[in-house]
């Protein structure tokens, strides 16, 4: 048994599961599968924008004052994960549309070698928003495939209604 640290969230873990399945179907040995999946995890990039910052405030990732000011001014942080898997702020914008545009631009800037990657998007009760993000991204980057899923379990609690998570 081997336990992977996804260093991602939501649909990032889905992509890791798909990579494990791909290795299994290719007949890889256990050690080769572990090595391949670890390299895959290192190559993943996770981005997200949340409609509501309450959960980040409640779990201590955002101070009450910052949360209050951001909510009052309609500031939406563009978030991502570090190579170690911790959450970091990549930028911010006023309003969800601008924050999503900033996230898409960030992904396009960083996503140079994406033709062999899968673009995966998860959303919390906002399928139209997810489809729009996918459409804009696919105009800017070339990927092997893309898909959209609903958030589930703990990811739904963290994303809150309106949250979008993108993993590439």
How should each PLM-predicted stretch be described?
Residues 1-2, 8-168:
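Mixed-charge interfacial surface used for oligomerization/domain docking
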């Amino acid at each position: 048994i081997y336990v992977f640290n996804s260093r991602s969230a939501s649909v990032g873990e889905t992509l890791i599961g798909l990579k494990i399945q791909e290795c299994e179907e290719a007949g890889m040995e256990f050690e080769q599968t572990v090595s391949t999946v670890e390299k895959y995890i290192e190559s993943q990039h996770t981005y997200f924008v949340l409609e509501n910052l309450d959960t980040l405030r409640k779990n201590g990732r955002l101070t009450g004052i910052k949360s209050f000011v951001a909510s009052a001014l309609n500031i939406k942080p563009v978030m991502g994960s570090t190579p170690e898997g911790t959450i970091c702020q990549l930028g911010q914008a006023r309003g969800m549309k601008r924050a999503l545009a900033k996230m898409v631009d960030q992904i396009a800037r960083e996503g140079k070698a994406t033709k062999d990657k899968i673009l995966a998007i998860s959303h919390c009760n906002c399928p139209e928003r997810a489809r729009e993000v996918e459409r804009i991204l696919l105009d800017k980057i070339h990927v092997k495939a893309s898909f959209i899923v609903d958030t589930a379990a703990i990811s739904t609690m963290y994303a809150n209604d309106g949250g979008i998570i993108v993993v590439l």
